A protein has these predicted regions:
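Conserved P-loop NTPase motor core
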Residues: 1-562, 611-612
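Active-site-adjacent structural elements in folded domains
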Residues: 110, 418, 802-804, 812
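Short, Lys/Glu-rich amphipathic helical modules
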Residues: 429-442, 620, 646, 673-677, ...
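Hydrophobic, well-ordered secondary-structure elements that form the walls
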Residues: 434, 482, 724, 760, ...
């Protein structure tokens, strides 16, 4: 009965059933395709494109296109996709995640849906986790696409914008996720449309989709610029923090890794820095530096979170174990770590543009992916990306043995046991792969193996340059490899001669990861394509995962039972403790990512509006009509700011409106009070607008239209970019402090949303105001680059604007508020 219900309601079963019917049709064409000449087979591409132009859909040509790509793969790379790979390709084409075990040929599988979707001419992006894999796959799998007459591009970090344009214009593009995101941000900072590199985002296939869309979802992509900040602040804060004692001067939450001063710590800070009150508003910057120094010294660990290489602090990717050169911790944390380690303190940066992977990849018209481990995170993929996880059957049954965890009271006993197990298996010639979470663990085990004179290789962030070479030999007889956090993912470990008879590859986990999915990735390195294999995790109650989630009770039980450091226990109750801890962390991390997305959605909506505004400016030959409409909007804001309490203008309002218009907008055709006095607000707006446009058009009459258009675009882009960068910083500060609203029984997210949109509306009003003022008060010089014109326009206006401010040292109650809100002072900051 249960099986019948499962078949009726299980989406995955129904999808696989549908895919199998299509796969049967594709398979039936195999003999027909194999008889075609190379020229005849390749000619199908043009035929498919013609059919699509004539109104057929991808669904109409799917079976034939898959069959053509399958045969082309066999002729170009000597591999014909198996039946299970056809199922995987279909799952990917329909916007799902294909979960395929290690060694099942994901790289070849994605060729089938990529070929089909590339026939539309709108572009297909195949995303990998690093440039090594992008380069390898673009050459290896790229030969199939080229054989079929499609163009293949490779997007690398060092390419010029022209080379990137050529790559993005190809039918198939191989790229890393980072480079795609940064190109998108850079495209929305250009001042000429011909400098953009990306086309509209059509279809994307993400390899190792769990790593990119889940593990890296909390890390935003940031393009930043330098800001001046004294290094002394970092060194002073670091010196003070190093003098503090845990639980007396500061406390650290093991679960969240949050570090904060106690009352005693605050008192010592006031004494150290000679302050009356540390939390006075004037000491905000100092408090920020102290908090970052606390985090740097007590929550961030050398060789775990970062390494020091050539006198620089380099971030370690927590999910791959690779170094992230060119990336920096934000908000001054990177500089705090540099002060901690005694290396040169780099200039702090200011965010110029930012986006999360979550929001970037959701912009694609169609998104799909593939990985060996995604089922445990299906809820997240479904809720955030609208993708289902389809588990693809293996080509051959998995015969790998996954042993129950061995639990030890302490780390020392656990490490000794791991070394003994390696020694025993190495003596038999069986290859061993040891997975560690931290660099320091890999180096500790390496030292222990060296003492035992066991030859081995270490693969971590410090020697990642030999990654491919080390992984290539990891399955050979007698090989011992220690890898940090699955460095080497994306490259299969193939068994050497005689290894199958020894039991295949032995995988040892030195501790459980926070996520069961990462553990499954480590297990998946063994037993590929029906090979034998063995996996086992060695766990201690001193491991970080169990320390954070209450292992003290169980450690006490082991002690009472008489278990010593080197004695292991295999018990379902203890194994459930580990799994329970992992589920808690996974749930917590999912909540964090959902919360991050909720907050980022606020910024994302605002980002889309700003970027749409920029693109409108770049894509139109002329924005002159838009500029004139902007003048009217700004004049309306001036007049409407005097209508807060009434629908009619008062006598003093007319004088204030007149002064604002004459000072900020008009040059030659200034207005007299008699021209607007007593008129309806709409008539006042029309009168000022007519004079403003007359003034502006007269200024432009000797200027060629193309120069005028260039000038208007330059000023508009510069103003928008300046305010947007400032707004990013403002929203970041709002986000940092919004959590405190919870103490006032207010939803922090709701408060952030409402206040964020209020700030955004005010920014839009200021953008409109400044564009109007700059254009009306600036002189136009011909034959200047757009950037130079914009900078000059802004510089000139800044001086003029300063003069206006100097006219009155006292702000009147009915004056426009200096904060730029557009309201009267008495109804804004003068309350």
């Amino acid at each position: 009965m249960f099986k019948i219900l499962k078949k009726m309601f299980d989406n995955e079963y129904k999808e696989l059933y549908r895919f199998s019917k299509l796969a049967d049709q594709i398979d039936a064409l195999d003999e027909e395709m194999s008889k075609l000449s190379d020229k005849k087979l390749a000619s199908y591409t043009d035929k498919f494109k013609k059919r699509l132009e004539d109104g057929e859909t991808l669904e109409d040509i799917l079976v034939e296109a898959f069959a053509v790509a399958r045969e082309a793969a066999y002729r170009c790379v000597g591999m014909k996709p198996f039946y299970c790979q056809l199922l995987g390709g279909l799952a990917i084409h329909y916007g799902n995640i294909a979960e395929m075990k290690t060694g099942e040929g994901k790289t070849l599988t994605c060729v089938l849906p990529a070929y089909l979707n590339a026939l539309t001419g709108k572009g297909v992006h195949i995303v990998t986790v690093n440039e090594f894999l992008s380069t390898r796959d673009s050459e290896w799998m790229g030969s199939i696409f080229r054989f079929l007459g499609l163009s293949v591009g490779l997007n690398l970090r060092e390419l010029s914008f022209k080379e990137k344009q050529d790559a993005y214009n190809c039918d198939i593009l191989y790229s890393t996720n980072n480079e795609l995101g940064f190109d998108y941000l850079r495209d929305n900072m250009v001042v000429k449309r011909e400098n953009r590199v990306q086309r509209p985002l059509n279809y994307c296939i993400v390899d190792e989709v769990d790593s990119i869309l889940i593990d890296e979802a909390r890390t935003p992509l940031i393009i930043s610029g330098g800001v001046m900040q004294s290094a002394n602040l970092y060194t002073d804060a670091d010196r003070f923090v190093k003098s503090l004692k845990e639980n007396e001067d500061y406390i650290m939450d093991e679960k969240s890794k949050a570090v904060s001063l106690t009352d005693e710590g605050s008192r010592k800070a006031e004494e150290h820095f000679h302050l009356d009150n540390l939390y006075n508003i004037n000491n905000t910057a100092l408090v920020h530096h102290i908090n970052q120094a606390l985090k740097a010294n007590y929550a961030m660990s050398l060789d775990v979170d970062y390494v020091v290489q050539d006198g620089e602090v380099v971030i370690v990717d927590q999910f791959t174990g690779r170094l992230m050169k060119g990336r920096a911790f934000s908000d001054g944390l990177h500089q705090a770590i540099e002060a901690k380690e005694g290396v040169k303190i780099q200039q702090e940066t200011k965010t110029l543009a930012t986006i999360t992977f979550q929001n970037y990849f959701r912009m694609y018209h169609k998104l799909s992916g593939m990985t060996g481990t995604a089922k445990t995170e299906e809820e997240e993929f479904r809720n955030i990306y609208n993708m289902f996880v389809i588990q693809i059957p293996t080509n051959k049954p998995v015969i790998r043995e996954d042993a129950t965890d061995l639990l030890y009271p302490g780390k020392e006993g656990k490490y000794n046991a791991i070394v003994r197990e390696i020694e025993r298996r190495h003596a038999d010639g069986q290859p061993v792969l040891v997975g560690t979470i931290a660099i320091e663990t890999s180096e500790l085990l390496s030292k222990m193996l060296t003492k035992k004179k066991i030859p081995h290789e270490v693969l971590n962030a410090k020697n990642h340059v030999r990654e491919a070479e080390i992984i290539a030999h990891a399955g050979e007889k007698g090989a011992v490899t220690i890898a940090t956090n699955m460095a080497g993912r994306g490259t299969d470990i193939k068994l050497g001669e005689g290894v199958k008879e020894l039991g295949g590859l032995c995988v040892i986990g030195s501790e459980r990861h926070e996520s069961r999915r990462i553990d499954n990735q480590l297990r998946g390195r063994s037993g590929r394509q029906g090979d034998p294999g063995f996996t086992q995790f060695f766990v201690s109650f001193e491991d970080e995962l169990l320390v954070r989630f209450g292992s003290d009770r169980y450690r006490g039980m082991l002690a009472n039972l008489g278990f010593t450091g080197d004695q292991a226990i295999q018990n379902k109750m203890f194994s459930k403790t580990v799994e329970s801890a992992q589920r808690k962390v996974e749930g917590n991390n999912f909540d964090i990512r959902k919360q991050l997305l909720n907050y980022d959605d606020v910024m994302n909506n605002q980002r889309e509006i700003i970027y749409a505004k920029r693109n409108e400016i770049l894509d139109n030959e002329s924005i002159h009509d838009t500029v004139l409409n902007g003048f009217r909007d700004y004049i309306s804001d001036i007049v409407n700011s005097h209508l807060v309490e009434s629908t009619k203008l008062k006598e003093e309002d007319y004088s204030e409106i007149l002064e604002a218009a004459n000072e900020n907008l008009l040059r030659k055709y200034r207005i007299n009070l008699s021209e607007i006095n007593g008129k309806h607000p709409d008539e006042v707006i029309d009168t000022i607008y007519n004079n403003v446009t007359r003034d502006y058009e007269e200024k432009l009459e000797d200027i060629p239209e193309e120069v005028r258009d260039e000038f208007e675009k330059a000023v508009s882009l510069r103003v928008i970019d300046n305010y947007w960068m400032e707004h990013i910083s403002t929203m970041s500060h709002l986000r940092d402090g919004i959590g405190l609203r919870g103490y006032a029984n207010t939803s922090p997210l709701q408060a952030y949303t409402m206040e964020g949109y209020q700030l955004f509306d005010e920014m839009i009003a200021r953008i409109n105001k400044d564009i109007s003022i700059y254009l009306l008060k600036s002189e136009i010089r011909q034959n200047l680059e757009r950037k130079q014109v914009a900078k000059k326009a802004i510089t000139n206006d800044s001086k003029d604007h300063a003069k206006v401010q100097k006219k009155s040292t006292r702000v009147g109650r009915n004056d426009p508020c200096p904060c730029g809100s557009g309201k009267k002072y008495k109804n804004c900051c003068g309350k």
